[in-house]
Design a protein with these regions (language model features):
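Single conserved hydrophobic/aromatic residue that forms the stacking wall/gate
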Residues: 1-13
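Glycine-rich phosphate-binding active-site loops on the catalytic face of alpha/beta enzymes
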Residues: 7, 48-54, 96-115
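Anionic-ligand binding region
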Residues: 14-44, 54-70
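Hydrophobic faces of well-ordered beta-strands that scaffold small-molecule active sites
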Residues: 21-24, 44-46, 78-82, 100-102
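Catalytic cores of alpha/beta
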Residues: 28-38, 80, 84-100
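Short, small-residue-enriched loops and turns at beta-alpha junctions
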Residues: 29-30, 51-57, 86-88, 108
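Generic structural signal for well-ordered alpha-helices
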Residues: 33, 64-68, 90, 122-129
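C-terminal helical cap(s) of enzyme catalytic domains, especially alpha/beta-barrels
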Residues: 108-133
Length: 133
C-alpha cells in the first residue's frame, strides 16, 4: 500500500507540473526490469552498479542484458549512470544505451576548483561529449 500511495502522489505531482517521472533501474531480475520499463516515461536511468555513487575504475554489471530487457518492453530512451567518470566509460555506456549520465565527477571538479570550476567543467564535458560522438 505504501508503494501504491507513493506512486499515486508522484503521478499527481507529475500531472500538476507537467514533468516526467524518471524511472531508475538497478541490476535486478528481468521481471522487475520489464515491469519498470513498461511504466517508464521521459527516460530510464540505468544504475550501472549497486553501492554508493561516485567514480569507479570499472563497471562489471551486465548492462547489455538490462538494456535488452528494457528495449523489449518500451521505446523510452535509457541512459546509464552511477560511477561514469572517464571519456572511455562514457563512450562504452553510450554505445550500449542512449547516453551516459555523469554527476559525481562534475561535483568533484566544482569542489576542487571553486570559482574557476566552469572552465574545468566545460573542458571535461567537451571531452565526454567528443568521446560519445
Amino acid at each position: 500500500l505504501h508503494t501504491a500511495y507513493r506512486r499515486q502522489r508522484q503521478m499527481c505531482i507529475r500531472d500538476r507540473y507537467g514533468v516526467d517521472l524518471i524511472s531508475l533501474i538497478a541490476p535486478t531480475s528481468k521481471n522487475r526490469i520489464a515491469m519498470i520499463a513498461k511504466e517508464a516515461e521521459g527516460f530510464i536511468y540505468i544504475v550501472s552498479s549497486l553501492g554508493v555513487t561516485g567514480v569507479r575504475s570499472e563497471i562489471k554489471t551486465d548492462l547489455d542484458s538490462i538494456v535488452k530487457v528494457i528495449r523489449e518492453n518500451t521505446d523510452v530512451p535509457c541512459a546509464i549512470g552511477f560511477g561514469i567518470s572517464t571519456p572511455e566509460q562514457a563512450k562504452k555506456m553510450a554505445d550500449i544505451s542512449d547516453g551516459a549520465i555523469v554527476g559525481s565527477a562534475i561535483i568533484k571538479l566544482l569542489e576542487k576548483h571553486g570559482k574557476e570550476a566552469p572552465d574545468y567543467i566545460g573542458e571535461y564535458v567537451r571531452s565526454m561529449k567528443n568521446a560519445i560522438r
